[in-house]
Amino acid sequence: MEGGRNCVMTVQQWQPEYNDMNQIRAIFSLLYLLVWVGAIVGNTLVLYVLTFNQVSLSVRTVFVGCLAGSDLLMCLFSLPITAISIFSRVWVFPAIFCKLIGVFQGGTIFVSSFTLTVIALDRCVLILRPNQEIVNFPRAVFIVFCIWLLGYSLALPVGIYSDIAVYDEICGTFCEENWPDFNPDTGRSGIRRAYGLSVLVLQFGIPALISSICYWMISRVMSDQLARRRGHNIRPESETKLVNRKTRANRMMIVMVVGFVLAWMPFNAVNLYRDLFGISKWYSTVFALCHVCAMCSAVLNPIIYSWFNPQFRQSITTLFKGTDEARLIKKKPQSTSKMVSYPTNFSEIRKETEIASTKTKITIAENDYRAGDQLL
């Protein structure tokens, strides 16, 4: 008997699943622990460098800080609660958390996806319109506010329709989604299916498409720039340097898009399968694997968007050396996105480049640069 109910079996006895096996639980416990520690350490270091170190306040720091904060919150609260719920298969937390966790988890996921999209758009605008102040510091802060408001608003339906459930014969308390048109015979809901499809499009489809287009446009500008420079009889070593920069930048952009797709596509696919076909004996195990992959984005994001930046690397190195070099440069707000220093050196603008040939010496001044010249 439990809480006045005559429960006669556990949920594991009533409906066994593969994730009830101790071997599977041990494997996933290790995976979740590694992701949890990696994400907390990585994003905490990013926030430390942005807040207390020598990185200037700029458009880029606003967006990267938003991404790191969202990922950190997701791993501090959402990850452990979801992991425990998957493998215990009962709700062991306070009842109010049943409603809050759905909103919190969905909101942080939306915020991360939208922030990654905004970073891609900001880079693209910076390259295509380098002489125009499109996004300044106040606008960046406002954009971040809108991202958080929109992200958590889109996640509200899960919280509204989530509630505690108990069953007479099954021991334990459960946190379940109870949509208005839920059919207990089929275990499906048309409203939940429509909402799931909307989440797939808004959280994964549109961000992946926009990011891919932005980075493709950036790559095209870089290729045009490299071809234009080659027409000036540049020295072989200068051409090699330009090619290496283009290759490095292209590699980084590919990692950004592929990392986002590989992290979130399985998670969205398994959720879509649940909405369309219901759950089966293997669903919880596959969901756990896809959830681990999605949480890996919180480990990958600090590496891609922060640590590949030489300034961040130097600050982190200084931090671990225990010196005070990180505070030598006073933080100073920058009002234009042209001051942004992206991890792949996209915004490095060379004031003057001398191109030597056998008979002539061509000097290209700063005002002779075209859109995208700061990429290489």
Swiss-Prot record:
The chain crosses the membrane at residues 30-50, 67-87, 90-110, 140-160, 198-218, 252-272, 285-305. Pfam families: 7tm_1. Residues 51-66, 111-139, 219-251, 306-376 are cytoplasmic. Functional expression in mammalian cells is temperature-dependent and requires a temperature shift from 37 to 28 degrees Celsius for receptor activation. Signal peptide: none annotated. G-protein coupled receptor for flp-15 neuropeptides. Receptor activation assays suggest binding to predicted flp-15 peptides, GGPQGPLRF-NH2 and RGPSGPLRF-NH2. Likely involved in Gi/Go-coupled signaling pathways. This is Neuropeptide receptor 3. Disulfide bonds join C98-C175. Keywords: Cell membrane, Disulfide bond, G-protein coupled receptor, Membrane, Receptor, Transducer, Transmembrane, Transmembrane helix. InterPro entries: GPCR_Rhodpsn (IPR000276), GPCR_Rhodpsn_7TM (IPR017452). CDD domains: 7tmA_NPYR-like (cd15203). It comes from the Eukaryota.
